[in-house]
Amino acid sequence: IRTGNTGKVVMPHDHHHVLATYHKAGEKEVQMAIDAAMKAHKEWSELPWVERASIMLRVAELLATKYRYILNASVMLGQSKNPFQAEIDAPCELIDFLRFSTFYASQVYADQPYSETGILNRMEYRALEGFVFSLTPFNFTSIASNLNMAPAMMGNVAVWKPSTTAIHSNYFLMKVFQE
């Protein structure tokens, strides 16, 4: 989406070096995002959780392999982290969030109330009505992912507003999510 109202992503350690130009969303674009999320809500929330979990695990695999180095480079340039900090934040912690969250979701869904003989007590989980709004931080790419993906794993839809100072790495996250 191009609005014509643009901003620049610069390196924190070299403000003269422009990494990217992005289009700022206004009220119209925010409403479009909400409408798109609500349109996807029924299908996404009714998708079996195992299928949603498999998508999350696929994202983790892509981050561990195909996109690991581009995400590291993006975090180093856009958030001024050294290679060790970038590796911990971007792929490692992000992959852990996705894999552990999938495991913990399976435990949540498996946990059922006690049933007396001849009675079946059962808990059925459902997504929230509406959407989750994620306003993600400037300093941790992994948290930017987790604030969106954890609710999505549980069947919710999310509207994501990345920090303007972390748009570079968050753009690559979005590309991985789309794949």
Placement of each model-derived feature along the sequence:
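Rossmann-like NAD(P) dinucleotide-binding subdomain of oxidoreductase/dehydrogenase enzymes
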Residues: M76, A105-E179
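Active-site loops and adjacent core secondary-structure elements that bind or stabilize anionic groups
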Residues: I1
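Glycine-rich loop-to-alpha-helix module at the N-terminal edge of alpha/beta enzyme cores
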Residues: G4, V10, D14-Y109
